C-alpha cells in the first residue's frame, strides 16, 4: 500500500498543474477577405489537427459573431477564447486590460489597405472633402478609416484639430456603403472601404479613389489580427501553439490555391453576396493584399493613439502587446 501511495505521489508531481482546454471558442470574425484565414482554419479543421499532433484532442466551436465591440465583450466575459479585429480595436482592448486579464495578440492575420472612394464630381482629392460631405465607415472614431483620417487631419490641421473629419463620418456596413455610393442617392458622398468592396466600386467609371490608409501609414499595414488573454496563453501552451500553426498554414493555403480560398469565402456565412469566384480571386492576387502573421506598422497605430489620448498606456515596442511566440518575426 505504501508503495502504491508513493507511485501516486510521484505521478501527481509529474502531472501539470492543470489540463489544457478540450474546447476552443473562436468567433468567426466580421467576414470578408480580412478574416478569410479563419474560414480556412474552420474548413480544414487546422486547429484540431495541430492540437492532435501535440497529443491533445480539442473541439473548436466557431461562434458566428463579428464586429470588434461584440468580440471584445465575448473575450472579456469568458464566452470566447480568441478574437479577431483590426489594430485600433485590439489596441483599445490591450490598453484596457494591461492591469487585468492582459489581452495580447497571437499574430497578425492579413495586411491590406483601405480605400476612400467617391463619385462626387467636385471631390477630386481628399482636401476637397467639405464640412457637409458624408463618409461611410464601419465605426466612428475607432475604426481603421477613422484613425487614418485622424492621422491625416493632424498632418493638415495640427494636433488641435485631429478629429476634424469625425463629423463627416456615418456608420454603415460595407455592403450598405457600396449601395449608397453607387446608387447616387445622396446618402453618402464617399465610402471608406476594403477589398473586395473597393474593387466592386471601382468598376463604376464614375468612382475614383482619393485616399488610402497606405498614404498615412507609409505603406503596407496590418488589417486584422488574432488575440487572446495572457491566462489562456499561459495555461494552454499546446493549444495556443496549435492556433498559431493553424493560422500560418491557413495563410499558406490561401496563397497556394486562391480559387479554393475564394470558394470558401463565398460559401461561408461571412461570404460576400453578389461576388463571383473570379472577382475574389482577382482581389487575392492583388499585391497589396498579403496573408502574413508578421505584424506591420501596428506600433504606428499605438504611438498615434497614445499621442491623442485614445489609449493611456504607451508601449515601448510592438513586442509589448504580442505574445513571445511571434516576436521572432520582423514585425513593426
Which residues make up each language-model segment?
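Sec/Tat signal peptide C-region and signal peptidase I cleavage site
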Residues: 15-19
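Short, glycine-/small- and polar/acidic-enriched structural segments
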Residues: 20-162, 166-171, 185, 189-195, ...
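Extracytoplasmic/secreted proteins, especially bacterial periplasmic and envelope-associated proteins
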Residues: 42, 46, 70, 74, ...
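Short, solvent-exposed loop/beta-turn-alpha elements that line the ligand-binding surface or hinge
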Residues: 48-56, 214-218, 285-294
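Pocket-lining segment of extracytoplasmic ligand-binding domains
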Residues: 158, 163-170, 175-267
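Secondary-structure end/capping motifs
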Residues: 234-312
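Conserved C-terminal helix/tail region of periplasmic/extracytoplasmic solute-binding proteins
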Residues: 305-332
Amino acid at each position: 500500500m505504501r508503495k502504491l501511495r508513493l507511485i501516486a505521489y510521484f505521478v501527481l508531481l509529474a502531472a501539470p498543474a492543470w489540463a489544457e482546454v478540450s474546447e476552443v471558442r473562436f468567433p468567426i470574425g466580421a467576414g470578408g477577405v480580412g478574416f478569410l484565414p479563419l474560414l480556412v482554419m474552420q474548413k480544414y479543421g487546422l486547429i484540431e489537427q495541430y492540437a492532435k499532433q501535440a497529443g491533445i484532442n480539442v473541439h473548436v466551436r466557431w461562434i458566428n459573431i463579428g464586429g470588434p465591440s461584440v468580440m471584445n465583450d465575448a473575450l472579456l466575459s469568458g464566452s470566447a477564447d480568441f478574437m479577431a479585429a483590426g489594430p485600433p480595436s485590439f489596441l483599445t482592448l490591450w490598453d484596457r486590460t494591461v492591469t487585468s486579464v492582459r489581452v495580447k495578440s497571437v499574430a497578425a492575420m492579413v495586411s491590406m489597405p483601405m480605400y476612400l472612394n467617391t463619385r462626387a464630381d467636385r471631390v477630386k482629392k481628399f482636401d476637397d472633402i467639405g464640412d457637409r460631405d458624408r463618409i461611410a465607415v464601419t465605426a466612428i472614431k475607432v475604426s481603421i478609416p477613422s484613425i487614418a483620417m485622424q492621422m491625416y487631419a493632424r498632418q493638415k490641421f495640427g494636433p488641435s484639430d485631429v478629429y476634424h473629419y469625425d463629423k463627416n463620418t456615418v456608420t454603415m456596413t460595407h455592403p450598405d456603403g457600396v449601395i449608397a455610393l453607387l446608387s447616387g442617392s445622396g446618402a453618402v458622398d464617399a465610402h471608406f472601404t476594403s477589398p473586395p468592396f473597393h474593387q466592386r466600386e471601382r468598376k463604376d467609371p464614375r468612382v475614383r479613389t482619393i485616399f488610402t490608409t497606405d498614404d498615412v501609414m507609409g505603406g503596407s499595414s496590418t488589417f486584422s489580427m488574432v488575440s487572446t488573454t495572457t491566462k489562456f496563453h499561459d495555461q494552454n501552451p499546446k493549444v495556443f501553439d496549435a492556433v498559431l500553426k493553424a493560422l500560418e498554414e491557413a495563410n499558406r493555403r490561401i496563397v497556394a490555391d486562391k480559387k479554393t480560398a475564394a470558394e470558401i469565402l463565398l460559401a461561408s456565412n461571412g461570404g460576400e453576396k453578389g461576388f463571383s469566384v473570379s472577382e475574389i480571386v482577382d482581389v487575392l492576387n492583388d499585391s497589396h493584399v498579403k496573408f502574413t502573421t508578421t505584424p506591420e506598422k501596428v506600433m504606428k497605430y499605438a504611438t498615434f493613439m497614445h499621442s491623442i489620448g485614445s489609449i493611456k498606456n504607451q508601449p515601448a515596442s510592438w513586442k509589448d502587446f504580442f505574445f513571445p511566440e511571434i516576436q521572432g518575426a520582423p514585425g513593426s
